[in-house]
Amino acid sequence: MKAERSDDLKLKALKRGHLAEYRAALCLILKGYRIVAMRYRTRLGEIDIIARRGDLIACVEVKARRSFDDAIFAVSSTAQRRIRAASEVWLSRQGDFHRLSLRYDIVAVMPWRWPRHLTDAF
C-alpha cells in the first residue's frame, strides 16, 4: 500500500515537471527563442531546455514552485555544475560551436501565473 502511494506521488511529480517544462518552452518560443532540445541527458548531467536565439544558446533549468524565490533557490550549486558539464558536451557536438555564446537561465513556473524567465542566472 505504501509503495503504491509512493509510486503515485513520483508519477504525479514527473507529470508536473514535464508540464512545467512545456510551459517554460512556450514562454521561450513567444520570446523569440527556438527550442533545440528538451531534457538533454549526458552521463554528466541533464539540461531541461536548450534554446537558441541567433548565436546565443540558453541552457535553461525549469523549476515548478509556489513562488519565484523558491524556484530560484531550488537550483543548487551541484545542479549548476551538472548543467554546465552537460552543456559543454552538447556544445562540443555542434558544428558551429566556435561562434556560439552560452548562457545559463532559469524559468520559474508558478501556479496560475505566467512563467518568469531569469536570464544569466548562474
UniProtKB/Swiss-Prot annotation:
Pfam families on file: UPF0102
Protein family per UniProt: Belongs to the UPF0102 family.
Organism placement in taxonomy: Bacteria, Pseudomonadati, Pseudomonadota, Alphaproteobacteria, Hyphomicrobiales
HAMAP family: UPF0102
PANTHER family xref list: UPF0102 PROTEIN YRAN
Name by which UniProt lists this protein: UPF0102 protein Smed_3545
GO molecular function term, any single one: nucleic acid binding
Source species of the chain: Sinorhizobium medicae (strain WSM419)
Gene3D superfamilies: 3.40.1350.10
